[in-house]
Amino acid sequence: VMQKKGMYLGGYRPFGFLSDPNDCHKLILDPVASRYVRLIFELALQGNRTGTIAKILNKNQIPTPAAYHVAENHVYSEQKAWDLQRSHWTSGTVYHILKNEKYKGTYVGAKFIMPVPCKHRVLRAPLEQQVRIEDSHAAIVTPEEFEQAQKVIMLQHGKHQAGNYTKHQYPLKGKVYC
């Protein structure tokens, strides 16, 4: 019910957002981190590959999402803080930011399903079962910029990495063994 209203229920907020101090289920822009996300999209729209963007961010010492959380004192242990301070941008981190619809203001929920109750295996839910709410929170990029970035990613990485395929579900998987 809360997801269908576009209320944010996740644990960690996406990089570039903060929880609204008046309502923890709403996202507001983080004035610093949202600029970093905006930069990532701008670099992608200029035709840069995700690996090139990661190198640019590392060269300019832009903190990774994990390192940014450490700097903002959202750390649970000294060991974790030490590990995260050594973190660096990767093409995978950049790719996941560019694919996240939250940056265009769209809430996407119920993305995963558990086909067998009490089993700890989850699968990506079909698109028609996912909850999608446009303009549920402030956007860092316009929907047009987001869609253009998706086209750039598809040209550079192809359909496989972009996640446009579904894994076949065998009905006897996990039940019959050879």
Q: What are these model-derived regions, one by one?
A:
Residues 1-177:
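Conserved catalytic breakage-reunion loop centered on the nucleophilic residue
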